[in-house]
UniProtKB/Swiss-Prot annotation:
Principal cellular location given in the protein's record: cytoplasm
Region of interest (G1), residue spans: 17-24
Binding positions (GTP): 17-24, 64-68, 127-130
Protein's name in the database: GTPase Era
Region annotation (G5) ranges: 175-177
Region listing for G3, in residue ranges: 64-67
Gene for this chain: era
Start and end residues of each Era-type G domain: 9-196
Keywords in alphabetical order: Cell inner membrane, Cell membrane, Cytoplasm, GTP-binding, Membrane, Nucleotide-binding, Ribosome biogenesis, RNA-binding, rRNA-binding
Length: 319
């Protein structure tokens, strides 16, 4: 733990976990700002999203990775490759485990990926412990201690210990990212694992995302929320043109949503344009909370068949 006069620590912490383990919720919670889109639909994070946390003289650059999912489809293989490439370079590997689910093939694959680093730079956090017990109104420390004991003794905890037998016990935590319970202890240990180094980014910075990326992601988030049952993974978003107007007080943006079939386009547009109009208004409201501009946004819907099989499209979307 950093004390007065200690050298600053700075580094990159990669957040890894199976789809819907709460990685984006955790990132937004520790950053204090919306950095990554959140959806109940698995694998909505497609890029390595960076969120920056400054605590005293320390700086943690979090990287929220796509949910790790074993699949032979080209799209999912590219997501897996993205995670693998980032694991090697990170200073700390934060493994978020959904405490409500059993150990399965995806957890086994993640443990195999992290096993070479378990002694030195892996942290494990059982997330969603609030779901296991509906109330956290009792003393927080007692609640987390009790839940941690139950999880470690259960089948999930035993399987994780067997897969990562050399992970130190003091680097295993129980948290609720949604309710921000147990995060302080986790963050203290994470800071201790960072190398002594100067900050990588200015102290007032909380993400390195471009405005175009944030616009694209928020549009996609609203589209997924409106059409979650029909086409969550069949769409992508993009910005065609963007500029600051009216003395840099207005952000004008022409964007698009692309789907794979005409029938999906009809769902996204809706009767008399009702769905795409609602997506546009929701995106504008979300952008106004994040950006210091008046937002002028136009969204069109187009069909882009087989985009998930084209290398150049995947390269532009997954990075």
């Amino acid at each position: 733990m950093v004390t007065d006069g200690a050298s600053p620590r700075s580094g990159v912490s990669l957040i890894i976990g199976r789809p819907s383990s709460g990685k984006s919720t955790f990132l937004n919670a520790v950053c204090g700002y919306k950095v990554s889109i959140v959806s109940p639909i698995p694998q909505t994070t497609r890029n390595t999203v960076r969120g920056i946390v400054n605590i005293e003289s320390d700086q943690i650059v979090f990287m929220d990775t796509p949910g790790y999912h074993r699949s032979d489809r080209k799209f999912n293989l590219r997501l897996q490759s993205l995670v693998h490439s980032n694991v090697k370079d990170a200073d700390v590997l934060l493994y978020l485990v959904d405490a409500t689910r059993q150990f399965g093939e995806e957890e086994a694959a993640i443990c195999a990926l992290l096993a070479p680093y378990q002694k030195t730079r892996v942290l494990l956090a059982f997330n969603k412990v609030d779901v296991l017990h509906n109330s956290t109104s009792c003393d927080e420390h007692a609640f987390l201690h009790r839940q941690g004991s139950v999880l470690r003794a259960g089948s999930l905890g035993r399987a994780l210990h067997a897969a990562l037998p050399h992970l130190p016990a003091d680097r295993v935590f129980t948290i609720s990212a949604l309710h921000q319970v147990g995060l302080d202890a986790l963050m203290r240990t994470l800071r201790d694992l960072l190398p002594e180094a100067a900050p990588l980014y200015p102290q007032d910075c909380y993400t390195d995302q471009t405005i175009a990326f944030r616009v694209t992601e928020l549009i996609r988030e609203q589209a997924i929320a409106r059409c979650r049952d029909e086409l969550p993974h069949a769409l992508y978003a993009g910005v065609e043109d963007m500029e600051l107007r009216r003395g840099k007080r207005e952000l004008w943006c022409r964007a698009f949503l692309a789907v794979e079939r005409e029938s999906q386009k009809a769902v996204l547009v809706g009767k008399k344009g009702a769905v795409i109009r609602a997506i546009r208004l929701d995106a504008i409201r979300a952008l106004r909370t994040l950006l210091p501009y008046h937002i002028s946004l136009d969204i069109r819907v187009k069909v882009d068949r087989s985009w998930r099989q084209r290398d150049h499209t995947l390269s532009s979307l997954l990075y």
